[in-house]
């Protein structure tokens, strides 16, 4: 079985692998669509904590066809078309019982692809606990839409959930890469009234406006905090979602956040051990400003609800895809694109049908 793997630090290449055994509750799938993520880039070329295992296949964003199921699987059969969530936890753990399935064995370990086993950039791949971790692909949801639901949509929307956005809230969205754009779309669907997006690339600005951004703050045009405060008549924003940025982003978010506001962060600060916070913007700890950051939950129920939003026309996740490929081997080129991030890129994807 061939797959695209992290051979060692900074080396991406093809390997032959053996799949994990299909247990009684598991499934074996073959990809119909795949997309690389910034997390894959971190794993190969960065400082990601998820895995440093050699010769491990990367990838955790896919839609697929079920090839084989274990004899205890009830709701899926060979031939079914499915969305494969990026987060496929072990649901038989205490953290899962407590509502944190994404951390089933410790921080972020619900992303079992790459963390514990080969990922989805292979001719076939293994999915644990299929009834809980696969989602049926609705007939009227395209492969392009579905592969963006598997990680980008669920992660971005989680930022809006963490921020507890309420109808009428003014929201600042830091970062308009693929996750940031999904955070923005999540804010729109949750009822934000005035959405301010921070970013500069024209291709992303266009999609940000289509997803509901009312104002765009370009950090090349001046201080980000000053621009947001000007757009809100000095009041600041009720909520902030962070889907992109750098070490300084959290302090900027605190600076524009009203007293009592909430920040929802899904940005992975790769390689940054210490994140600075401006004490004054946090009221030196007394401003009742809440910082919440996390990995999105996983599993079937969440995927199927998100797919409903797409199926019934509330939202089109496929707008993220700017570079599309059609051969299995093209996933390597897509990975390099995701690493290099040309200005006309939001998200590459490989669509095999």
Task: Locate each region found by the language model.
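Mid-domain Rossmann-like dinucleotide-binding core that forms the NAD(H)/NADP(H) cofactor-binding site
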Residues: 82, 136-221, 226
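N-terminal Rossmann-like NAD(P) cofactor-binding module of classical short-chain dehydrogenase/reductase
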Residues: 83, 238-241
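NAD(P)H dinucleotide-binding glycine-rich loop of Rossmann-like/cofactor-binding domains
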Residues: 90-174
